[in-house]
Amino acid sequence: MAFKIWQIGLHLQQQEAVAVAIVRGAKECFLQRWWRLPLENDIIKDGRIVDAQQLAKTLLPWSRELPQRHHIMLAFPASRTLQRSFPRPSMSLGEREQTAWLSGTMARELDMDPDSLRFDYSEDSLSPAYNVTAAQSKELATLLTLAERLRVHVSAITPDASALQRFLPFLPSHQQCLAWRDNEQWLWATRYSWGRKLAVGMTSAKELAAALSVDPESVAICGEGGFDPWEAVSVRQPPLPPPGGDFAIALGLALGKAY
């Protein structure tokens, strides 16, 4: 395993940063390391990095522990993204024209300069449409600058909620939605969609299911007494991570896409 590339998921939360490193064998997934790094107050606020310099200072000792051969999948808060669905245009477009059309359409929808946005899109599996996810360029630039300061290799920046999709194959057949919660929010994902709900006034899985208009029995919750994300890792050696769902997003990022 010493020569394998470490796949690392890094999840920056309001009070802490958590990270998980795995390597892949021919048929198995091996846990290498996990980290839990407390963050001072006001470094991150409502998903936005407020004090990038202090964040870099906190993460620098961690970054120095990483092997040279690594890829980091970095979480981007779903609260800082915008999602829209647009019907496919009637005319056939090449990839470049299609990207330009979606960029302009999204910018007009949000009344923003196209250059101020970065976006990704996929074809809707259930209808003739494109699902577009956008974020402000300056917020992504902040993360890339952080990576440069830490001298780490970032291979992907991914909405945090979408990382939960990686665990859906591990759920019982009657459950199609996985949710994760911290003090401020719920993150949720199904095979075809993902998102975020504020936790205020929504304290149970039943209330979340009602907000999503799904059967409560179809929702699994990450954490003790619910779904254990570590089931997705074939081989775990001590020191073992704490039980519960605190590392779910970071682990999902490290594992990569399920579909």
UniProtKB/Swiss-Prot annotation:
Transmembrane segments: none annotated. Disruption phenotype: Mutants are unable to use DNA as a sole carbon and energy source. They do not show a growth disadvantage in stationary phase growth in cocultures with wild-type. GO terms for biological process: carbon utilization; DNA catabolic process. Gene3D superfamilies: 3.30.420.380. Required for the use of extracellular DNA as a nutrient. This is DNA utilization protein HofM. It comes from Escherichia coli (strain K12). The gene is hofM.
